[in-house]
Curated annotation (Swiss-Prot):
UniProt GO MF annotations: signaling receptor binding; toxin activity
Function according to Swiss-Prot or TrEMBL: Promotes colloidosmotic lysis by binding to the midgut epithelial cells of both dipteran (Aedes aegypti) and lepidopteran (Manduca sexta) larvae.
Keywords tagged on the record: Plasmid, Sporulation, Toxin, Virulence
Record-linked SUPFAM superfamilies: delta-Endotoxin (insectocide), middle domain, delta-Endotoxin (insectocide), N-terminal domain, Galactose-binding domain-like
The protein's name in its UniProt record: Pesticidal crystal protein Cry2Aa
Gene that produces this protein: cry2Aa
Pfam families named among the record's database cross-references: Endotoxin_C, Endotoxin_mid, Endotoxin_N
BP term (GO), one: sporulation resulting in formation of a cellular spore
The keyword ATP-binding is annotated on this UniProt entry: no
Inducing factors: Transcribed starting in early sporulation and into later stages; not expressed during vegetative growth. Third gene in the orf1-orf2-cry2Aa (cryB1) operon.
Keyword DNA-binding included in the entry's annotation: no
Additional information: Toxic segment of the protein is located in the N-terminus.
Amino acid sequence: MNNVLNSGRTTICDAYNVVAHDPFSFEHKSLDTIQKEWMEWKRTDHSLYVAPVVGTVSSFLLKKVGSLIGKRILSELWGIIFPSGSTNLMQDILRETEQFLNQRLNTDTLARVNAELIGLQANIREFNQQVDNFLNPTQNPVPLSITSSVNTMQQLFLNRLPQFQIQGYQLLLLPLFAQAANMHLSFIRDVILNADEWGISAATLRTYRDYLRNYTRDYSNYCINTYQTAFRGLNTRLHDMLEFRTYMFLNVFEYVSIWSLFKYQSLMVSSGANLYASGSGPQQTQSFTAQNWPFLYSLFQVNSNYILSGISGTRLSITFPNIGGLPGSTTTHSLNSARVNYSGGVSSGLIGATNLNHNFNCSTVLPPLSTPFVRSWLDSGTDREGVATSTNWQTESFQTTLSLRCGAFSARGNSNYFPDYFIRNISGVPLVIRNEDLTRPLHYNQIRNIESPSGTPGGARAYLVSVHNRKNNIYAANENGTMIHLAPEDYTGFTISPIHATQVNNQTRTFISEKFGNQGDSLRFEQSNTTARYTLRGNGNSYNLYLRVSSIGNSTIRVTINGRVYTVSNVNTTTNNDGVNDNGARFSDINIGNIVASDNTNVTLDINVTLNSGTPFDLMNIMFVPTNLPPLY
């Protein structure tokens, strides 16, 4: 144990945070409710070109990974994507993507894609019917297995998937490819889980286990590479950059991040994957490229392990009469300085001006775990009354689950809300970000003021960014404002995102690294003998603890829980990995051993890493897997 982590700080939960709320609200929702919420979202809430079915599918897959009920995912997935055999929802996804990217398939390619959609849904429907007939036979004699149908369906998937990877349209077709990959990987998982009931031989079962690993690798790498190629070509305003990322996360990476977890069963995924939203006001004209993204990303993520309570800042409203004695006036509302506040008295650095007294405070009012923020308004613009009077407005407003609102100014314009997502962090940028900041990403929990270059007209202004994710199984706040993770009451497995640590030593050499295939981002250690501590509220169950790590070089992992130390030496994932290249990380899931999450107790979990080769180490996921449900590969 590092002395840094034994510096006298004790873990005490804030009593006011332990209130009646449902930390497993997503798991308790029915699929019908989820579908209705996404339909309502599309109807009333968002201008983003996203078909609501994409949100329903990601929620469905997360619920299936977290459940033992129903082993035939493909049958249910077909009903969601192709209701009554219709391809309309898949065509909706394509039309929405065409509008968002301002690109269209040519006539011949569109006809080809539509024909593939019709063929794909018909193939899956026929396969599902064959399985139904096998399980409820009307013919005699009853076939001993359905292997022939399984192998035929496998080949049909292999024939059809390339039709959604057409040269010149890879990005445009990526959301359709992701849905087709969802169905293919669900099919393979179904074969593995139903092998006994379907009469699948041991040899065929081994083949399909290999298929699950190999096609998870291939499809993940294709999606990541296609997205990154497009992202590297961006040179645009922050709003447009974040909107592109959010669009691709909803349509593609919500699925990619689940695929690598398909090998687990009954694993409740506590996601740390974020959606970002910002305003589209005309004042923010600074352009950003992919080279600037590491800094921006670190700014938005730096305090993700704290429990958000609100913001404070300086809002100004100034009216100037028109010059020369002409009638009319110009009124300007602006947020000129902002600070993000968290439980435990923790605050971020200042955004915008650093020398102004704050004159407003926006908080959840009620305990932040009970009533977190879920919606933001971040736009700005200009209203004109006639030809002589104008008002430059700005919003920076937020709403809780109880519809309580607060902010710098009144809510107006487009709102940012996603079903089952909470605003777990708020960040922001000044009018212009200094070059010296753009080249220096923030380290873990760094407090740094972010301001415009001296002398920039309007440089005092701040523009906020809301950070949305699904993380909800939070028991309480530690004394230092970080989250205590809550284990499920039953024997369901669960995950902890590594970025949601209680505390970390060597912070100046620890960074959050963006990941796409992992249900959240990694904690990157660049200094040896670094320890990350996590706190969880136990349930008394025994689990196999798996750590998803990337170690390009030899490392030693020491895990301490309940006074017991587990050591794994010579960890090197350079070649021994799952094959996915996730933004430079090549990961493998390491079985640390059997642990017990003590019942009704705050349990500390310390993960210490020694870098024997001096190379960076990514801690990508912490998984508590039921002992009776080993991974499928």
